[in-house]
Amino acid sequence: MAKGKENRIVITLECTEAKKEGKPVSRYTTTKNKKNTTERLVLKKYNPNLQRHTLHKEIK
């Protein structure tokens, strides 16, 4: 039988540059495998409030 999906968790990515500029932050939700990726994710995603791609870091 197949094993359960307990290794994959849902995380939230939040824009880091919008806070510095005083604009509303953009948030994305995604999943990650906590066994393969133990550190926090940092991805470049589009922020519609700033109308450009910015760094989004994983928050708790």
Swiss-Prot record:
Name this polypeptide is given: Large ribosomal subunit protein bL33
InterPro entries (alphabetical): Ribosomal_bL33, Ribosomal_bL33_sf, Ribosomal_zn-bd
Origin: domain of life: Bacteria
UniProt-listed SUPFAM superfamilies: Zn-binding ribosomal proteins
GO cellular component: cytoplasm; ribonucleoprotein complex; ribosome
Organism, as annotated: Chlorobium chlorochromatii (strain CaD3)
An example molecular function term from Gene Ontology annotations: structural constituent of ribosome
Lineage: Bacteria, Pseudomonadati, Chlorobiota, Chlorobiia, Chlorobiales
Recorded family membership: Belongs to the bacterial ribosomal protein bL33 family.
